Amino acid sequence: MSTRDIIAAQSAAIEPEAFQSAIAAGMTRALLRESAPPCLLRAPTGSGKTFIISRVLEAVSAERPTLWLWFVPFVNLVQQTEDALAANCAGLIPVMLSRGRNQDARAGMVLLSTAQGVARARDRNAGYNADGDDDTRTLAEFVARAKAQGLSIGLVVDEAHIGLDKTTEFGKFAHWLNADFFIMATATPKDERLLEFLQQAGKSAFESFAASRDEVVNARLNKRYIEAVVYDLRQSVQTVADLKRTVLRQAWKRSQRIKKQLQIAGVPLTPLLLVQVANGDKTVEEAEQDLIKLCGVHPALIGKHSSDDPDPVMMAAIANDSSKEVLIFKQSAGTGFDAPRAFVLASTKSVNDADFAMQFIGRVMRVSRPIREAYPKSMPIPPDLDTAYVYLAARF
């Protein structure tokens, strides 16, 4: 291992909750059976899916030396996953796939990538053996060397409902890999799609492990309540522009009320209002001007992500910058980032897909560490601070 592969975790280690330990133990037992079934982890956003899976990988690798390939749907999740593994699992070696495939495979090594990183028809047609040179080992060569060393191969797919379709390039890659261990995780499972994929891949029906919402709420990982205000674009006599401004105005008022409640309670936390807008050239700037002119928000309090493509560094910087009280972002960059200090989400983008709605509502479901520290489990969290508020302009 070279010094550049020693990852310094940026987050603190997590003490497992009882439900997390129970799920990890059950998945480990299933994978270590003589015929390991594919395992699906169903769990709400914020429940610790990455943490649970990392414990499974560590336990399985201790019994059967295994090289793991872990795929996520969004580029900003690669670094988050690497950090979580480094913080919580001394027995695992997280490394980016692009770099790790040029190293010697070893037990507990976890190669991290987006699904798109291996989802290329050109590579598939060449048996994933065409992008090498004197300095770069192909993925096929790397996997073959690992198997020759006696290592088992494990595949982890985060947000499996997105990529695991028999017709997608990533689905075809997963079929080619033919992993000994197969773990899928999702907050919005689509069983029919997963079953179809598994059948095409020659796998048996998966074994399911679930974290209930009650377990996650009682562990103070998710807020207990959701309050949604929906402005139906079909029923209103207001113009679309007026409805969008109403959404922003009401969401900002709610965020400011929460800010005052936190100050009164002595909780050192500045709430963040998330504003999701449609993709387009001027949608972010239009929302910014409405917040400044109609709501009186100081420009310095507003953080913006204007690109159509996610920028993980920028998103994380704004989400963690307590001088910012608003983060405006486009639909295309609206999933796969953490913002624990967010209580309120405003969407001026018409939403008509239930699965996508649940994905972005998950951005305001987490309970921040200052709230958990201010209200230990023996004390109830005040309902207003234990609620995720969602303001939507919708067309159902």
Regions found by a protein language model. Give the residues of each.
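Conserved interdomain linker/interface between the two RecA-like ATPase lobes of SF2 helicase motors
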Residues: 205-305
